Each structure stands twice: as C-alpha cells, then as structure tokens.
C-alpha cells in the first residue's frame, strides 16, 4: 500500500513530467520549426492603437487566414479573427496564435498614453477620411463635391478640408455642445440617411477618434509634429498560388526615425483585381488565372507597392520554363520574367516573319519581292544582324522615326510658324541619320539655345511657352510619367504631388525668349 507521502511525491513527479513534455512540444512549435509571427512583440502606445499580425509557416508561406487568434485578457487588448490587434487600456498580456497543431504566444505591452498625445486633424482625421473613401474622386473628393459637401481629392489640401468640415455652411457639420450629435458622425455612422452608406460603425476605433477630435475642440497638427517620411507594405513582393490568401502590413516611418503600423488606416487598390484583389484589412486574395498584379497601399499622401506574381501551374505548362539563348540584356530580362511566371518562350520566328517585322519596325514599310528573295536565300548565320544594320543606315529609317517623334513633340505652327516646324523635322531626321545618343538628344531639347529658324531643338521650348506645358511634355517623353494630374491635386495613383509638379516646373521658369512668336510665319 502506497503511503500519503509517497503518493504526493509520485503526483508531483507526474506533474513535472507532463509539464516537461508540454514545454518541449511547445518549444518545438515556437522554435525554428514553428510559426513566425510579425511583429514578434507588440508594443502599443496607449488605448486605441492597432497592429496587424502576419503569420508564416515553416516554408515561409502566409497562413494568417488559417490561424485562430485569442487574447488572454480581452479587457486589455482585443484581436479580430484576421489578426488585427486593438489596445483597450495600459497593461501587459499575450495573444495566442493557433495554426493546426502549432501554438505560439505573442507578448503585448501597452504603455500609458502620452499626456501630450491627442487626436489632430492632419495626423488622424485625414487618414480616416481617405481610408474610408470620403475624399475619393467618386465621393466628396470630386470636382464639385457631393450633395453640397466638397473635400480635396485624397486630402491634399488640409486647410480647405478643415474649413469645409468645421466652418462651411455655418458650421453645421460639427456640434461641439454634443459631439456625438455632429452631422459628420451621424452621416458617417448611418444614423441619418447618407448616400455613401455606413462608413464608421459606432463601436469602431475610427468613430471613437473622430468623436474625441470633436470633443477636444477640433485641434490641428503643429508644425513641429512628426511627419510621415515614407510607408512600406510588407511583403513588397510575393508569389502566390491560385485562390490563396496573403496578409499584408503597412508601416509608416516618421521624421524622428520611429515607425508605426498603419494597416488599419491605409487605403488599398489592386491594378488587376481579377488576378489579385485586396480587402480593406489588407488581405490579398489571388484569383484562378496566372499573371502579375500590383497592390498599392496609400497613407498620408505616401505610396508603397507589393508586386504579386501568380506563375502558370506546372500541370498546364507542358514544356518546363527555359531561358532564352541570347546575350542581349533585354532578352535576359525577359528570360528572368518567363522563369518567374513559369512560362516557356515561344520558338524563334521564321525567317519570312522576322523579315516582315524588322522592315515594319525600322523603316515603316514591307520589303519588296526582290529584297525578300535576296535575304531569304542568304545562308550566313549573322544575316539577321546584318539586315538590321543595313536598315538602320537607310534614309527611310530616319524619315520614319523622325515622323514618329514629330507626332510626340507636336509643334504648333500657329505658335512657332511653319518654317520652324520644318526646321524641327529636319533636325529630327539628322539626329537619326547621325545616330545621336539618346541622352544627347534629350539634352539638346531641354537645354536648347538658339533661333527656331536655325536650331530645331529650340522649337520645342518655343512652342510650349509656359513652364507647366513643358513639365507635362518633358515628363511624359523622357521620364515616362504623367505629372499633369499633380498640377491641381495629389496624383491619385502615384507618389507625386503638387510640390513635385511645381518644383519640376521651376526648372523651366527662367527660360528667356525673344520675338513675338504669335503670328505665323514671322516668329523666329
């Protein structure tokens, strides 16, 4: 018969053994063979702060959508089923992340809110208005607003928006005596009819921030407040299988070197939603088709892009991807892209197909029957290269491509006169005949100096008389970007704003011109 003392010792031994087994299996899950959590430790500054969790398995695959999240203290911090963490009060706790048989705990530390920290218009309200589409081009950000309420497109004009919300229409949108009855909140939360629908649920963090801003007297940001330097979407590049999910995170980096998770305030957009769509919480959902898509995240006039690649399934690709047998750098780039997308390059074009294409591309016409028979009969291994060089030395090449560039530059004879237009066209043909390097070609146009009767490059500067016109043309032709959208407001799909447009235009602001340049053909 076992005595009480021996029984107690035996029970303690069993408990110790069970604890050792549990911790060893747990350390196996938490170690190198377990889950990877981003961020590994969550630190929040006061209540109302939010962070998005990403979970990766041992293969580096995103499994956030397949995880179960649980807060050990829901009074301190709560977590959604998509891994979005929201602080309720200062304290410490842990969040449990479960994926199949793997379990991991994430430490959460919530500090007391800074005494000087407060909700301000530029720092907090504008991101909310942008995140929920209030200042989008399809809503109040359109040219004349919506239903009597206009905001600047994507919040590019803080002064205009602040006045529209707090003072316009006799200040009817804000009710400081009873902040929760403010029209701004009642419309956005759906308490009164709103054409845009319910945007801010009353139990949501965004609603609470707008309410606090109204209660505190609608403060604005000060000049010494931290500024957003840039944002980063994580991951910046991802390869996905069809019909899978990947969670993104958006980090904002500030002027003092600190960073903050702003996934919940970022606005997302996909370039090809059929291939890869993204929801408001930053979860990417791939479609059934292979291809590439760019996911854009926008926050406080800053942009970041995640490139999504969906390679062709091997079961659909009979031939394995092979590299192009070429030393040309363009072919090498194409080869890398083919391998990345799981594509096999097409076979080389037949000689007669190549002949037709190279004639049309270089001199803009088909080969004659005699030219075709002569070249097809050649047996030299480098006959394609020799043909291209011969075509590049022909006068038709210069005429054909000068005409293309004249279409791009589009000189107006009513601005510069017919003679100047002919001078420009002659200069373009000479550039192609002499094989002028492209950088020198661009330099001669941008830094043109001379008469439009003698210097063809100066016709472009003379024709586009205003700095903003030159900015539009030069940015399109030589930078490959469209800056004209940023002339009136921040570019809706690029990183460029009004400052970028007018800083660029300032380069052309001091160009001097002589002569009237009004009546054709006397300008010169």
Features from the language model and the residues they span:
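N-terminal secretory signal peptides that target proteins for export/translocation
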Residues: 1-11
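Flanking scaffold residues of small Cys/His-coordinated metal-binding clusters
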Residues: 129-134, 480
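Axial heme c-ligation environment in periplasmic c-type cytochrome domains
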Residues: 146-149, 180-209, 345, 408-418
